[in-house]
Amino acid sequence: MKVLITGFDPFGGESINPALEAVKKLPNTISNAEIIKLEIPTVFKKSLDKIEENILAHKPDILISIGQAGGRFGITPERVAINIDDARIQDNEKNQPIDLKVFEDGENAYFTTLPIKAMVKEMQEAGIPSSVSNSAGTFVCNHVMYGVLYMINKKYPNIKGGFIHVPYIPSQVVNKPNMPSMSIEDISKGLELSVKAAVENNTDIKTAQGEIC
């Protein structure tokens, strides 16, 4: 089994992206699955082009993209991606799409095909803060999650795919009062446990991970 796991380069004025750094720290094998690590640009469309190049090159069974979500307290597997690009800031090539569809012929939304509740359970049992998220935003993270699930729906039905957001690391919040963070070691361990859950669970577990509002 092969797992392709991607991490974005730094964006938004940050000098580091914990998503990419945590991906780099992952072992090369998890639960007997080969781990293929890929850096992708925080750029609309180019990020998806690079992912598809690597789908064709490596033919992964599982594809997990990792992104930074500053302000979150834990590691948050995403439930759903929506068919909209609405960028509050420019990407790394100064693109700023507003109210545009990711793919014109795509569904309004796609749900992850990863066992996200099993992933959360693995992390929580290891003492790592984690919860299911119901919004991947409308920037490049959602763009990538939606695009990957679109490609799975249209062309690569045998791949399981989805997205995980991670918090800032401590060095990023030195001048951000009251902003939560998590050590890169805990983030990487959480991702390792998430991959383990994805490899070992063909279907998700049934446990309450919803929100009131």
From Swiss-Prot:
Entry keywords, A to Z: Cytoplasm, Hydrolase, Protease, Thiol protease
Residues of the active site: E78, C141, H165
Q: Broadest EC class?
A: hydrolase
- UniProt keyword annotation of Iron present: no
- Protein name per its UniProtKB record: Pyrrolidone-carboxylate peptidase
A single GO BP term for this record reads: proteolysis
NCBIfam families cross-referenced by the UniProt entry: PRK13197.1 (NF009676), pyro_pdase (TIGR00504)
Q: Where does this one sit in the cell?
A: Cytoplasm
For this UniProt entry, the molecular function terms from Gene Ontology, in alphabetical order, are: pyroglutamyl-peptidase activity
Any Pfam family the entry gives: Peptidase_C15
Q: What is its EC number?
A: 3.4.19.3
An annotated GO cellular component: cytosol
State the family it belongs to. Belongs to the peptidase C15 family.
Q: Keyword DNA repair on this protein?
A: no
